[in-house]
Amino acid sequence: PKFFLDIEFLILKKQIYILQVRKLNVKKSSIKNFSKPLNDLEKKILKMTKETSHLIGKERYFSTMTDWNPAEILGIKPKPLATSLYQKLITNEVWSESRLSLGYKDVTKMPLMYSFLGTPYIDLRTDINSFFISDLPENIQLKLYAFYVKKFKNAPHFYFDKIESNLVINCISLDKKKYIKILNEARLTHKEIKIILDKYTNLTKNLIFKLNENINKYNYGEYLLKKIKKSQNSSINKIFLLQNICKNYGTLPFANLARMAFVAVEFLESLESLKIISNHEKTKFLETNKSISFEMSQALRKSKLKFLQKYGHLRPNTYEILTPN
């Protein structure tokens, strides 16, 4: 095909509704004989699945759209620089440091993303482990991991890009019956269910108190960026300084805030499921939040120079920095 499309759709009463269609960044391969690289890749993955690890779970799977969904953000065949930037700024360390700082399990020595023949994949085992509570008993983690993986294998099309919202328990909202139903399906005991509910409830409460801290950190990062741009440092020095600022004051607080946003949506959904608010009220509330796209549309109506100063760095694929913007 000349190009590939990412199509998001839903099916309601046998009627298909198209939500979004976008072109995927796919680089045509110059390799004509795929036998050797595919055989080498098979050996590599088999070796990886047999490696011992301190993580819970023996079964290991990889997905292009789980969690930080690289297939959408980077494309199916991103350039090496785009892949390495994404790893440097997010999937090598930052993502796991974020989870740890919020009270989740320590998986900081484990990278989240691997590149297989140029296609980025998320390590599902590492990802699931990162949503366990840091002091959750190991026997409970084992049961949950086996349950999550079984559900993922049975319906990968349903979970591959939304495990944090549709598969793994990572917070507790107002609708506790929802989680109890899931945990009963996983065949956990009443005692184990109580432990899980208590620990994730405490984690959820603690998340709320870390909101301002991360907003302030993000804002301070913007101040540092302006300072670096005005400095007399060489371009090489600026590159390294900008990398550190982007990691510590950009993607790290962003990862924390994104996690909090997921939890906030979970609470909104629970308010609706408990019939405290209607779907219409939930939608209206969400519409009051000024999204990035809303702010961009407002900025477009003003000065072109100011718009470019704020959004001029954007391009169809953020991490393909060699692509003209």
Spans of model-derived segments:
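Conserved divalent-metal-coordinating catalytic cores
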Residues: 1-325
